[in-house]
């Protein structure tokens, strides 16, 4: 049987304008570059770490 991997839905709710360059780069790394863009990502420790870095700029929903 194939295992279903957990996913998280991440939506950008904050603007990267005026933010540090590493926070902007993290948004781009998650595939978010414009307001209200949504991505469904695999729930891995690396992705969770990136989300923690920019928690004030994104909304996260577990799927």
Swiss-Prot record:
Q: What is this protein called?
A: Large ribosomal subunit protein uL30
Entry-linked Pfam families:
Ribosomal_L30 (PF00327)
Superkingdom of this entry's organism? Bacteria
Q: How does it assemble?
A: Part of the 50S ribosomal subunit.
> Which Gene Ontology molecular-function terms are recorded?
structural constituent of ribosome
Arranged from A to Z, the UniProt key words for this protein are: Ribonucleoprotein, Ribosomal protein
A GO cellular component annotation in the UniProt record: cytosolic large ribosomal subunit
What GO terms describe the biological role, i.e. biological process, of this protein? translation
Coiled coil (residue ranges): none
InterPro entries on file: Ribo_uL30_ferredoxin-like_sf, Ribosomal_uL30_bac-type, Ribosomal_uL30_ferredoxin-like
Organism of origin is: Rhodospirillum rubrum (strain ATCC 11170 / ATH 1.1.1 / DSM 467 / LMG 4362 / NCIMB 8255 / S1)
For this chain, the family text in UniProt reads: Belongs to the universal ribosomal protein uL30 family.
């Amino acid at each position: 049987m194939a295992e279903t991997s957990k996913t998280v839905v991440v939506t950008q709710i904050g603007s990267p304008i005026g933010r540090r360059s590493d926070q902007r780069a993290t948004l781009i790394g998650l595939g978010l570059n414009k307001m209200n863009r949504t991505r469904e990502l695999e729930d891995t420790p690396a992705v969770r770490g990136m989300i923690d870095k920019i928690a004030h700029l994104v909304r996260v929903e577990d799927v």
